[in-house]
């Protein structure tokens, strides 16, 4: 317990820092409807959009794509369809996006997303998480 008798709160004023965060599930798989992100951005009053693209079959498709062309290996629909239709409004409203669309080529996905933002005349911060590719040691 903290000094206010609340369980779980950490430090003075911890309860005052709590705020509601609205998360919209924009996709559940590669090939999911492109309407989800559009509807969530237009009507969902969301703080975050989450796109889940990866499954075992998808990973094998992306690995094969990367073998043919190292510039791919990510879920291209994320950039070319999903983000293209909502990017400007996402930036204007300060909605944050979390996605695993980078697949086996997260840097390539990030580059494509930055290029899309530039083509739409919007500034976009993009972060990439990588380091889980075990193929070099297999």
Where do the PLM segments sit?
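Metallocofactor- and cofactor-centric catalytic cores in central/energy metabolism, strongly enriched
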Residues: 2, 15-138
């Amino acid at each position: 317990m903290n000094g206010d008798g609340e369980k779980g709160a950490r430090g003075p004023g911890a309860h005052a820092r709590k705020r509601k965060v609205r998360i919209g599930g924009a996709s559940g798989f590669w090939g999911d409807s492109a309407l989800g992100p559009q509807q969530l951005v237009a009507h969902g009053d969301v703080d975050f959009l989450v796109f889940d693209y990866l499954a075992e079959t998808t990973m094998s498709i992306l690995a094969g794509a990367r073998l043919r062309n190292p510039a791919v290996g990510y879920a291209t629909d994320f950039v070319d369809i999903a983000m293209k239709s909502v990017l400007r409004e996402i930036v204007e409203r300060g909605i944050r996006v979390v996605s695993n669309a980078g697949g086996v080529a997260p840097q390539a996905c990030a580059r494509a997303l930055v290029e899309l933002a530039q083509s739409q005349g919007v500034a976009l911060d993009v972060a990439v998480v990588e380091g889980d590719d075990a193929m070099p040691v297999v």
